[in-house]
Curated annotation (Swiss-Prot):
GO BP terms: arginyl-tRNA aminoacylation
Gene from which the chain derives: argS
Protein name: Arginine--tRNA ligase
Keywords for this protein: Aminoacyl-tRNA synthetase, ATP-binding, Cytoplasm, Ligase, Nucleotide-binding, Protein biosynthesis
Record field: catalytic activity: tRNA(Arg) + L-arginine + ATP = L-arginyl-tRNA(Arg) + AMP + diphosphate
Origin organism lineage: Bacteria, Bacillati, Cyanobacteriota, Cyanophyceae, Oscillatoriophycideae
Subunit structure: Monomer.
Organism listed in the record: Trichodesmium erythraeum (strain IMS101)
């Protein structure tokens, strides 16, 4: 089913053209959902914006629009409010019919997009030989959620993990391990990621202090680049060890990714530089090959170039990012590229994309978006750190979330005098703990910093994952208590919206498709979180004010179906956020 707001736009388009002529073809009718029910369910704000063009008063324009508008099949007669707002209220019988259609459809009557795209999403992207930290949390779960929504909408999505698996650091680390711990370069089973991080720090210190070691490290990089067997073997061991550690976290968070690290693009780098040179875009600066761009300056106001080939002949991140961009467009056929990175990288990618545009590598039909995000802060308002001032390891954060969720659950079970199996406790604690972390992040506008608080994110009240999960669990409890077979009820669904709380709930259930379209365009998962939180609130109000199991037929079945549709909508919405539901909590 097409979202109501889209249906309205189509009807208003016709009304505008009929009333004012072909000059208004393509005019945005400015239809929005209202935030206050006293203004109806939807509002058209176009009359004010047309006043100057049509040389008439907004109210007069609004009247002409209404006189040519055909929406009587599902709206009450429109009302003009204020200077020229057109307020629209849905008819209950239309809402009932729509809900009945949605209930009978497995995908909640959400049709795939009419214009599927090849979308590449670059997210997570940790560095080999370094542990994933709290900063990787945002990129990983925001990218995963956007991928899920776009896939559900029918787009062809390629999820890419652009891991940092190449560069000088490998020369340093391999050289250091050859001296300090040669056994580590024979098998990937000897070291864990924590050992690699420690060795990396030691190798960096040695590199900064010892010129001979610097030369060895640089030679090791040359050996890697030329394919020396022992160097490549050592590099592959380090990569495999890191991959195993990363996969533990990806499995825990249920993240699916295709690894395509920096090394994948190595063979393409000379060609990128040669083409930029052929196009006359390269300039030499301090021995390096650069592209100078307008609008990028340092603190002194001097132009800052994008370096694509260093003075020592090596390439850097920018060259690799250009090669990746070209490959994703030319070989993968991407028409939408989404980079999920922290806000600190926005300037770098702006430079890369500007160079690519100047080179003619970005066709007009290709959209490139930097989905940037803010910092995770501690409760002191500063960047989240451990007590010793270290960066928080992501695995430690997730483990702590699960442990805290378990403690809360065990306390609640004790208070309720409930006995549950160890398997039940372990499963609920893991789902609630991980869901709380994901939802606390995704429910924030990704562009903002947010304060990380276990107490807030694990609360059973408020805009939290446990609150949403509990609303789902509540419906499952109704099903068990009344021995209800929802699948059977759905076949002959008949909805009756008798009382205000069920009417409000019914209207909200119709808006999922509209919200998913907004997420697809704006790439803001918090829009979906807001919808699901409001759904849970409206459901709880309905449940508290409208008897379900004790109602007489046919109202009883209608209300049961509203409960079922709420649960199905919550389950789908939470899945699109990367969150699993529970039958009991």
């Amino acid at each position: 089913m097409e979202p109501i707001v889209e249906q309205l736009k189509s009807r208003f388009d016709k009304a505008l053209i009929t009333a004012f002529g072909q000059d208004l073809v393509g005019t945005d009718p400015m239809i929005v959902s209202t935030t206050n029910p006293k203004f109806g369910d939807y509002q058209c704000n176009v009359a004010m914006s047309l006043a100057k063009k049509l040389k008439d008063k907004p109210k007069a324009i609004a009247t002409q629009i209404i006189n040519n508008l055909n929406i009587n099949d599902y709206f009450y007669p429109p009302e003009i409010a204020g200077p020229g707002f057109i307020n629209l209220s849905l008819k209950p019988e239309y809402i009932e019919n729509c809900l009945e259609t949605i209930i009978k459809d497995e995908k909640l009557n959400i049709s795939p997009t009419k214009n599927p795209q090849r979308v590449v999403i670059d997210f997570s992207s940790p560095n080999i030989a370094k542990e994933m930290h709290v900063g990787h949390l945002r990129s990983t779960i925001i990218g995963d959620s956007l991928a899920r929504v776009l896939e559900f909408q029918g787009h062809n999505v390629l999820r890419l993990n652009h891991v940092g698996d190449w560069g000088t650091q490998f020369g340093m680390l391999i050289s250091y391990l050859r001296e300090a711990f040669p056994e580590a370069l024979k098998t990937a089973d000897i070291l864990d990621i924590g050992d690699l991080v420690a060795f990396y720090k030691q190798s960096k210190k040695r590199f900064d202090e010892d010129q001979d070691f610097q030369e060895k490290s640089r030679q090791e990089v040359v050996n890697l680049q030329t394919g020396a067997e022992d160097s490549r073997h050592a590099w592959e061991l380090l990569c495999n060890q890191s991959r195993r550690e990363f996969q533990v976290i990806y499995d825990l968070l249920d993240i699916k990714l295709n690894e395509r690290g920096e090394s994948f693009y190595n063979s393409m780098l000379p060609g990128i530089v040669e083409e930029l040179n052929r196009l006359g875009l390269l300039e030499e600066s301090d021995g390096a090959q650069c592209v100078f761009l307008s609008g990028f300056t340092n603190k002194e106001g001097e132009d800052v170039p994008l370096i694509v080939k260093k003075s020592d002949g090596g390439y850097n991140y920018a060259t690799t990012d250009l090669a990746a961009l070209v490959h994703r467009i030319e070989k993968e056929g991407a028409t939408r590229l989404i980079y999920v990175t922290d806000a600190g990288q926005a300037n770098h990618f702006s430079q890369v994309w500007q160079v690519a545009k100047k080179a003619g590598w970005i066709p007009e039909n290709v959209e490139i978006v930097n989905v940037f995000f803010g910092l995770v802060l501690g409760e002191d308002g500063k960047k989240l750190k451990t007590r010793s001032g270290e960066t928080v390891r992501l695995i430690d954060l997730l483990d702590e979330a699960i442990n805290k969720a378990r403690n809360d659950l065990e306390k609640r079970l004790k208070d309720e005098k409930r006995l549950e199996s160890e398997e039940f406790i372990k499963n609920v604690a893991q789902v609630v703990g991980l869901s709380a972390v994901k939802y606390a992040d995704l429910s924030q506008n990704r562009k903002s910093n947010y304060v990380f608080s276990f107490d807030k994110m694990l609360a059973l009240q408020g805009n939290t994952a446990p609150y949403l999960l509990y609303a789902y669990v509540r419906v499952q409890g109704i099903s068990r208590k009344g021995e209800i077979n929802f699948e059977k009820l759905r076949k002959d669904a008949k909805i009756i919206l008798q009382d205000e709380p069920e009417l409000v709930l019914g209207k909200h259930l119709l808006k999922l498709n509209e919200v998913l379209n907004i997420v697809t365009i704006e790439l803001l998962p918090n829009r979906l979180c807001e919808y699901l939180y409001e759904l849970s609130e409206k459901f709880n109000k309905f449940f508290e004010n409208c008897p379900v199991l004790k109602s007489e037929e046919p109202l009883r079945t209608s209300r049961l179906l509203l409960c079922d549709l709420t649960a199905r909508t919550l389950k789908l919405g939470l899945y699109l956020l990367g969150i699993s539901v529970l039958e009991r909590m």
